[in-house]
Amino acid sequence: MASALPPSAGQVEILGSSPWQLSGRQRQQLRRRIALIHQAPPLPPRQRVVTAVLAGKLGQWGLGKSLLNLLHPLDVPGARDVLSRLDLADKLFVPCQQLSGGQLQRVGIARALYQAPEVMLADEPVSAMDPRLADHTLALLCQHAIENGVTLVASLHAVELALAHFPRIIGVRDGQIHFDLSASEVSREHLDTLYANEQLSTPTTTETPATAPWTPRC
């Protein structure tokens, strides 16, 4: 979906385009409209948080502006604003190497929010956070998607978080879709089938993934 790899079969369409039918330049322009939220954000250890957040706009800035931003952050108020939404405003000028895993994940989310994309693809975005913080962060992401007409697709291990925050749940196992239902339609039987031969008691943040897309424009 991020148009990083061509599909081995079939077609992928995102934002009305089939990425691998576009030219390289057109595909790069498409990628600027998509934000990736990584489980382990690829942030240089010595890079300051403010620079990491502002990097969300690198795909939209020219080379000169991007290089200048490395020397002197160009939008400190903008970075501070998104960090404050994630309770990280006090880390604005802290090197990334001084942050915990959960804090790094929130910096990655702040960068995606600052990018202001049309689509956000999140891979285990809250796996390093405690339950309260994970719940708060997913609520913030979903609210942002609703208010800004952004499509949010998240891959989550935590079934209870997926059911609590996303209206549509896709259960995937061994590369196959087992069900595609609204959250209210997902039953214990569906989960038992999805997790056959695996222990499923009280869901925790270490369970097998469920994919939960949020598409407010549909």
Short names for language-model regions:
Residues 95-99, 103:
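Conserved ABC ATPase signature
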Residues 2:
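Helix-to-loop junction immediately C-terminal to a conserved catalytic motif
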Residues 120-123:
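Catalytic Walker B motif of ABC-type/P-loop ATPase nucleotide-binding domains
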Residues 156-157:
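H-loop/switch region of ABC-family ATPase nucleotide-binding domains
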Residues 66-90:
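Conserved ABC ATPase "signature" region
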